[in-house]
């Protein structure tokens, strides 16, 4: 982009092409103007008129007023705007009287006034001087003479200011602006006058011939610079001799009047060029002055010299990229002057000539007739003809997506350009890598039948308190957006408590009359002096949680309660729920033994305060092996159930323990479920810690050495080029090669004249991999940058943006992590990536030395010429066709998020498509494949707004139907693949709950909401990756399908009898070891090596369902995946045997319906509200165990026809995960007319009323004070929501109406 010093110019030329002919003013029209009732817009206009107080401080004058040079007394005592309007109106009318007295209108109406004489006459009249001499010469004949020649016929001194010779006229320049009371040039918003409010700011020399001009110039040569308009000068050719001295207020340095006039003319020229139209005639095409004496063009040290240099370009029609206001303020002119005097270069296309202005013949400028303009053809003039629309400045940095042209530079050239332009070191801001939310994991410790020795439980890692790990934990904590973390954790635990049931009765452990003690209640909250969760509990806004009868608070920092040391015996009563949000670090710090003692003491206090059958909850900062040993030694008999709740808010080992069913004869014990929970906890801790290692600490300047950071280049007035490799273009190419392309931002900010262009992006370990693959650095197409003229806000160097990435990005990141890990296998030589996508993201995931062939139906957005063709290739084509595979070679293949779309495009089902694809990959040489497939590995359950599963059409509908793809059930899909490749190992991969994939989110600067983690895991279980390895023999599993709690046999071929077995479930090793020394935390397991068959035999009785991944590790070698097997839970079938209609009971005695469902599933009655299943009032409906059977007990209510009840499975993670059986039989019940019935509100927040025979009967929302006859308030509420009453109604016909 072109610039003259600091003035940025658009590479487009635009001027008007038609000049307006000067029309002298007729006498009658002059009188009309002067007699106007409002002279605003006729003789003057107020530039800063304030309509509120009707004030103004700057007046712009029009002819003939603009010839007036006010008397010094007028200047010294300025009028306010009201007085000005009265003054000028009165004087104009008086002037009319003088004119008409001398020249009666009827005889002189059509005569033309000489504008020079008229202006001088009006000016002297306003100054109370004699105007007789001017009145004698007021008229002239425009067809015979010019305003100047009509005057030079009378060559003498007309007045002291108006001197006439035979070929010239000298007169002072009238004030083009009048300043009034309140004028303050130091105020930025004051309109600029350019010094033209000062009387005699310049002297004007009109001339009638060129010899006269020469004579005048000779006389003025020794004085100040003389300016001249060459194009259509007003009233005739003239020279302008600016007043000597300087004008204050426009710059920190002194500015001469000549320079200021030159600046005004250039600003006018640039504005007129921007607004020019071929259909509009203007006074002159070239608005700029031209210095004609006493001017040195050899340097550019002064404002006058620089403005003149710019003016020579303005003639051609150049336009400023910044709009010039119609009424420039002092601030606008100061800014323009500052930019013009800033660092930069002059234009050198058009040289200065004293008496001539050069113009480009191809420009739209049409020169006037005369000697003052000459054509000139500059070399390499980069402008073209065209208009430019000023685009409003942007309110933020602009995102730039790179596009490449067919050109490269060497890596060394790119590095050199980067070093010359890089901003380094940078001070970056981090933003927040966690925007909010919580990821909650829940483990049923007591529900696991297999004991596990406490002494063998995994312990807190030895390096947990190492300085580096503590620093990274603190960094992660500070990278979470501000929120009440305690409230978020509390809500996660109470959401679980709302679903907690007695395993024997299936009833909620918290009944409707429970009391609650909150231990560790603190007043240190942003908007409350008590724990924030208590407001939600009191209001009943936690679905399924009854409102406590009372809540009592204890702790160190309590306000609404009692101060108490809860590690000691306490003098209190007992409560149905004791919630201990106590920090052992408060007393113990990082002293682990002391923290263990404090935790055990606090647990004892909580249990002592809990009513029989109640619930105790304890927060434990460090769940160490020593702590668990003490728990089971001291308190194993104190409760019926034990759950571990882990709300991940920050990266700590803190957990909540939930002891249910307080008693004295319990039998709690350490189980394999506890070991799995701890393994998962510490694995997630380690994963987050690894992710944070990529993030620099606060306060560390970014010098380019950290994995995650910002790379930036700054260029001043860059001239990007798509034709040559210059510094700006090279620097841009270098930057783009270093950063994530989708993260690149672009800013343009004025910087004391030059425009500072900053281009920056996010540097990550992934972008480093792509850069390492480049052989040369590709050059970018810069048309979008060259087009940018708007300014932006300054750059913001922030590592994490403000919005969390969507769930789909989390899944993609998890798969990126997996593919990256898999392709590090040194045995891979040539990868084929199907459905790559134009952006070629695979290049950032795989080792830079791995040969890769990418393919997609769309053209490649990368410049493939910048890569070594022996290592990197891109094939554009449809891989679903046979023709695509001609000449394709590989030894491995990936297809991520492409097969479903390809199958849909081909119009075939997924299994058939895979059966067609896999042989083609194998024929191309592929022995390993990673195929992402649409198949529900676990429950066939939709994810609202993400994936809707259409069971009839066998398709997934993504994002509300935005994309529709076929899916296949995993068993027939796997069988079809095994039939094609019977000797291949098959392994499924989904996102692990241990979050080992988080480095590919946090580590690359992507923020996330922790609540999305569990959703992303569920999404991946619907769209898993299948790893097919034809070099590895498959697992042989018997039986298939493999049911839960039944022994199965898994045979694993191996030539190494000393290989170590590892079986993983959800990212955690659950079986590991060697024959005779195998440890299992997922059920009984035995391992032996059968030498004759060269195989391992794993006999396994699984206690948990899901997918298990098998690995064998030979000494000194990496683990080898050997396949995966699936343990299936029992069928989710539910059968409900309702009583016959004639035997239904409509009283509070209720009814029972026999439930047939596998006892593996614990059931509860719920409604679906606000996107989730919510447990109903157990008095309304509940599941009752009558061993060995289970019954649905329910009380009928008129609301039942309007609220659908569900039988839902209950798991530690929630309700309805696998079973949500609609109880339509109750929903469709016809209520009798001859029997009393019951009526309640439908659900929390719902309203209803009753009518009878079409007439209003009773409101249930706002019941009347006096109930209708026969209606009674029931002693027992059997409403869906426990807080609402139930009414008994006499026999009758009722209509239940939802409000």
Swiss-Prot record:
It is an enzyme of class 2 (transferase). The keyword ATP-binding applies. The gene is S1. Its main location: virion. Its EC number is 2.7.7.50, 2.1.1.56. It catalyses: a 5'-end diphospho-ribonucleoside in mRNA + GTP + H(+) = a 5'-end (5'-triphosphoguanosine)-ribonucleoside in mRNA + diphosphate; a 5'-end (5'-triphosphoguanosine)-ribonucleoside in mRNA + S-adenosyl-L-methionine = a 5'-end (N(7)-methyl 5'-triphosphoguanosine)-ribonucleoside in mRNA + S-adenosyl-L-homocysteine. Belongs to the aquareoviridae outer capsid VP1 protein family. Gene3D superfamilies: Immunoglobulins, Reovirus components, Reovirus core, Vaccinia Virus protein VP39. GO terms for molecular function: ATP binding; GTP binding; mRNA 5'-cap (guanine-N7-)-methyltransferase activity; mRNA guanylyltransferase activity. The lineage of its organism: Viruses, Riboviria, Orthornavirae, Duplornaviricota, Resentoviricetes. Outer capsid protein involved in mRNA capping. Catalyzes the last 3 enzymatic activities for formation of the 5' cap structure on the viral plus-strand transcripts, namely the RNA guanylyltransferase, RNA-7N- and RNA-2'O-methyltransferase activities. It comes from Aquareovirus C (isolate Golden shiner/USA/GSRV/1977) (AQRV-C). Keywords: ATP-binding, Capsid protein, GTP-binding, Methyltransferase, mRNA capping, mRNA processing, Multifunctional enzyme, Nucleotide-binding, Outer capsid protein, S-adenosyl-L-methionine, Transferase, Virion. The keyword Transferase applies. This is Outer capsid protein VP1. GO terms for cellular component: viral outer capsid. It is found in: Virion.
């Amino acid at each position: 982009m072109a610039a003259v010093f600091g003035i940025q110019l658009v590479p487009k030329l635009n001027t008007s092409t038609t000049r307006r002919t000067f029309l002298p003013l007729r006498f009658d029209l002059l009188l009309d103007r002067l007699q106007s009732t409002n002279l605003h817009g006729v003789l003057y206009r107020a530039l800063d008129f304030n309509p509120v107080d009707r004030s103004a401080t700057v007046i712009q004058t029009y002819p003939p007023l603009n010839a007036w040079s006010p008397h010094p007394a007028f200047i010294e005592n300025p009028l306010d705007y009201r007085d000005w309007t009265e003054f000028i109106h009165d004087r104009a009318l008086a002037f009319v009287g003088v004119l008409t007295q001398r020249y009666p209108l009827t005889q002189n109406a059509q005569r033309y006034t000489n504008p020079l004489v008229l202006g001088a006459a009006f000016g002297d009249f306003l100054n109370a001087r004699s105007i007789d001499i001017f009145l004698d010469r007021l008229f002239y004949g425009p067809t015979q003479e010019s305003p100047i020649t009509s005057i030079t016929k009378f060559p003498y001194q007309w007045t002291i200011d108006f001197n006439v010779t035979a070929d010239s006229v000298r007169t002072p320049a009238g004030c083009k602006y009048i300043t009034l009371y309140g004028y303050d040039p130091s105020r930025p918003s004051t309109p600029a006058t350019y010094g033209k409010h000062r009387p005699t700011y310049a002297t004007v020399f009109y001339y009638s011939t060129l010899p006269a001009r020469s004579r005048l110039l000779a006389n003025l040569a020794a004085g100040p610079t003389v300016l001249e308009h060459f194009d259509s000068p007003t009233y005739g050719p003239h020279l302008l001799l600016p007043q000597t001295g300087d004008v204050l207020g426009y710059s920190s340095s002194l500015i001469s009047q000549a320079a200021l006039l030159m600046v005004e003319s250039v600003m006018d020229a640039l504005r007129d060029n921007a607004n020019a139209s071929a259909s509009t005639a203007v006074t002159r095409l070239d608005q700029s002055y031209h210095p004609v004496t006493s001017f040195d063009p050899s340097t550019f040290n002064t404002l006058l010299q620089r403005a003149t240099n710019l003016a020579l370009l303005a003639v051609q029609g150049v336009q400023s990229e910044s709009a010039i206001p119609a009424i420039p303020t002092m601030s606008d002119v100061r800014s323009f002057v500052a930019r013009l005097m800033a660092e930069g270069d002059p234009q050198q296309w058009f040289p200065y000539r004293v008496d001539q202005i050069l113009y480009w013949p191809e420009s739209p400028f049409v020169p006037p007739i005369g000697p003052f303009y000459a054509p000139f053809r500059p070399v390499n003039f980069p402008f073209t003809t065209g208009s430019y629309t000023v685009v409003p400045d942007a309110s933020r940095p602009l995102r730039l997506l790179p596009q490449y042209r067919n050109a490269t530079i060497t890596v060394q050239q790119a590095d050199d350009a980067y070093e010359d332009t890089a901003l380094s070191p940078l001070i970056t801001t981090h933003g927040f890598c966690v925007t909010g939310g919580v990821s909650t994991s829940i483990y049923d410790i007591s529900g696991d039948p297999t004991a596990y020795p406490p002494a063998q439980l995994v312990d807190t890692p030895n390096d947990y308190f190492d300085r580096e790990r503590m620093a990274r934990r603190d960094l992660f904590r500070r990278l979470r957006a501000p929120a009440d973390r305690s409230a978020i954790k509390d809500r996660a635990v109470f959401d679980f408590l709302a679903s907690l049931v007695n395993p024997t009765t299936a009833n909620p452990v918290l009944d409707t009359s429970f009391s609650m003690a909150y231990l560790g209640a603190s007043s240190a909250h942003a908007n409350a002096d008590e724990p924030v969760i208590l407001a939600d509990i009191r209001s009943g806004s936690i679905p399924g949680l009854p409102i406590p009868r009372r809540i009592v608070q204890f702790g160190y920092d309590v306000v609404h309660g009692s101060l108490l040391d809860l590690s000691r015996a306490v003098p209190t009563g007992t409560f149905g729920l004791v919630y201990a949000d106590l920090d052992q670090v408060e007393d113990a710090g990082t002293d682990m033994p002391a923290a263990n003692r404090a935790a055990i003491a606090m647990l004892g206090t909580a249990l002592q305060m809990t009513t029989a059958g109640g619930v105790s909850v304890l927060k434990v900062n460090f769940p160490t092996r020593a702590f668990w040993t003490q728990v089971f030694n001291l308190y194993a008999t104190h409760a019926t159930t034990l759950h571990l709740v882990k709300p991940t808010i920050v990266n700590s080992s803190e957990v909540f323990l939930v002891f249910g069913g307080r008693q004295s004869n319990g039998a709690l014990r350490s189980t394999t479920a506890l070991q799995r929970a701890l393994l998962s906890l510490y694995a997630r801790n380690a994963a987050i810690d690894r992710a944070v290692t990529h993030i620099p600490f606060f306060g560390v300047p970014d010098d380019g050495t950290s994995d995650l950071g910002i790379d930036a280049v700054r260029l001043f007035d860059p001239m990007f080029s798509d034709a040559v490799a210059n510094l700006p273009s090279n620097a841009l190419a270098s930057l783009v090669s270093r950063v994530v392309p989708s993260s690149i931002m672009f800013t343009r900010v004025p910087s004391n004249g030059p425009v500072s262009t900053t281009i920056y992006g996010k540097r990550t370990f992934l972008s480093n991999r792509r850069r390492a693959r480049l052989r040369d650095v590709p050059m970018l197409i810069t048309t979008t940058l060259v087009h940018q003229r708007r300014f932006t806000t300054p750059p913001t160097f922030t590592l994490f943006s403000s919005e969390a990435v969507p769930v789909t990005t989390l899944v993609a990141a998890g798969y990126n992590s997996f593919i990256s890990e898999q392709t590090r296998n040194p045995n891979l030589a040539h990868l084929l990536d199907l459905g790559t996508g134009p952006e070629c993201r695979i290049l950032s995931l795989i080792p830079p030395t791995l040969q890769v062939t990418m393919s997609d139906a769309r053209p490649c957005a990368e410049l493939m010429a910048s890569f070594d063709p022996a290592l990197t290739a891109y094939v554009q084509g449809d891989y679903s066709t046979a023709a695509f595979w001609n000449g394709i070679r590989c030894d491995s293949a990936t297809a991520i998020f492409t097969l479903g779309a390809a199958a849909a495009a081909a119009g075939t089902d997924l299994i058939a498509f895979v059966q067609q694809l896999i042989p083609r990959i194998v024929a191309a040489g592929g022995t390993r494949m990673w195929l992402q497939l649409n198949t529900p590995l676990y429950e066939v359950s939709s994810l609202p707004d993400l994936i809707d599963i259409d069971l009839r059409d066998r398709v997934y509908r993504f994002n509300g139907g935005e994309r529709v793809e076929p899916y296949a059930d995993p068993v027939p899909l796997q069988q079809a693949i095994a039939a094609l490749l019977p000797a291949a190992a098959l392994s499924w991969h989904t996102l692990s709950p241990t979050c080992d994939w988080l480095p590919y989110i946090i580590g690359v600067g992507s923020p996330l909401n922790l609540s999305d983690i569990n959703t992303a895991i569920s999404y991946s279980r619907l769209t898993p990756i299948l790893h097919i390895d034809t070099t590895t023999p498959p697992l042989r599993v018997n039986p298939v399908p493999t049911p839960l709690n039944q022994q199965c046999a898994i045979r694993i071929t191996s030539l190494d009898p000393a290989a170590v077995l590892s079986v993983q479930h959800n990212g955690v090793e659950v079986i590991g070891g060697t024959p005779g020394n195998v440890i299992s935390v997922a059920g009984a397991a035995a391992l032996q090596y059968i030498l004759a068959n060269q195989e391992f035999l794993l006999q396994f009785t699984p206690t948990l369902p899901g997918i298990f991944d098998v690995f064998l590790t030979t000494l000194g070698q990496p683990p080898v995946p050997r396949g995966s097997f699936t343990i299936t839970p029992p069928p989710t079938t539910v059968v409900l045997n309702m009583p016959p209609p004639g035997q239904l009971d409509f009283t509070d005695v209720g009814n029972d319906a026999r439930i047939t469902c596998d006892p593996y599933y614990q059931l509860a009655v719920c409604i679906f509200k606000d996107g989730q299943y919510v447990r109903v009032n157990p008095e309304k409906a509940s599941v009752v165990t009558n061993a060995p059977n289970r019954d649905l007990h329910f009380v009928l209510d008129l609301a039942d026809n309007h609220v659908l009840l569900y039988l839902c499975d209950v798991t530690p993670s929630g309700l309805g995960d696998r079973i949500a059986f609609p109880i339509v039989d109750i929903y469709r019940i016809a209520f009798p007319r001859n029997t009393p019935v019951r009526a309640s509100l439908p659900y929390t927040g719902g309203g209803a009323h009753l009518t009878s025979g079409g007439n209003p009967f009773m409101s249930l929302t706002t019941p009347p004070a006096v109930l209708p006859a026969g209606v009674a308030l029931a002693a027992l509420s059997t409403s869906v929501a426990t807080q609402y009453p139930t009414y008994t109604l006499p026999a009758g016909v009722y209509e239940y109406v939802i409000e």
